[in-house]
Amino acid sequence: MLLAMRNLQPDRVPVAPDFSNMIPARLTGKPFWEVYYFRDPPLWQAYIDAVKYFGTDGWFTEGDMQFHYPREYYEAVEDIRKTHERWVVRRRCILNRYPYQKETTYYFADSPTETEKPIKDLQRDCALIRNWFTPPTGYNPSILRQQRQELGELGVFGISIGYPGFQHWFSLFQGGLQDLVYWYYDQHELIAEMRELHEEQALAQMAMILEARPDFVLLSGSGTITLQSPSIARELSLPTIQKLTHMASQAGVPTMLHSCGKQRVLAQWCAQETDLNCINPLEVPPMGDCDLGEIKKMYGDKLALMGNLHTSQVMLFGSPADVEGAARQAIDAAGAGGGFILSTGDQCGRDTPDANIFKLVEVAKTYGRYT
């Protein structure tokens, strides 16, 4: 995995389908709220168990830094409404004297959803936002040590980090993308300030992550040019991507960027304007806009690639034979010379047949061997 991530050629094409959430939770046999609410087991442990079950090359992205922040934070559960299908958990919180509320819906057999988000108004809540994006002052490595030990040699150990932009902020604001778009044009000075605050926090986080020496760092930016236009992404997101990847390059730690949805333009920027090592998931149309062979031809000398079997048409609704054909096609398109990790075009659905994942692994371990 690390050789491929660094755009080198290993003994075979690594295989790491994206199943970081729903499939590991399903394999526990428990209601999903046991995993997401009670952390029994924690999701990261369920993922490692899934890697063992399927025999994939582990792509661990949940390294928990337990950052310390210079702020006072209190949280209490105000109300829980339970049915056999869902638990709706409402929390009251105080961050440095600034109160807010949030609500999370935990489902029996689906990933949770934030049904009330903490920040309601950009201008009214600007003090809360400034406290939200304070840089950390330290971290606690205790869970990192436990996670590394549990993963062992099953895969590569990664820590994720976000960066400024609508793709991150929409999960914080009750009005979501609609409000962010209006504020971008009507209150641009506050959006610009939030970008600077978020970048300052991310750079401090990255310095500590690099001190912890993971195998790689994942820049987590799902929808970077899908949830905002490329022009907005260049203003809000790209400068921080450049700084984060440069820091990691200087430290000798490879970086990968995950951004589902459209990604062709983002791949161009990353190849030509950043120090990024690897990009994923390079989704095909209509969800994305990438052709694996074209991306390999245009940017394969600078970027390792990870992707990109269709998560619904092939992995969820297809047969093992369909998976085998698509996997061979992906290896043919991007496997030459290394620098390729066989994966899916984003998260596999909960009901993806186990047989299809087993077939993907089989193809990588047979057809994906370099001679």
Predicted regions: what they are:
Residues 43-62, 208, 212:
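Catalytic domains of carbohydrate-active enzymes, especially glycoside hydrolases
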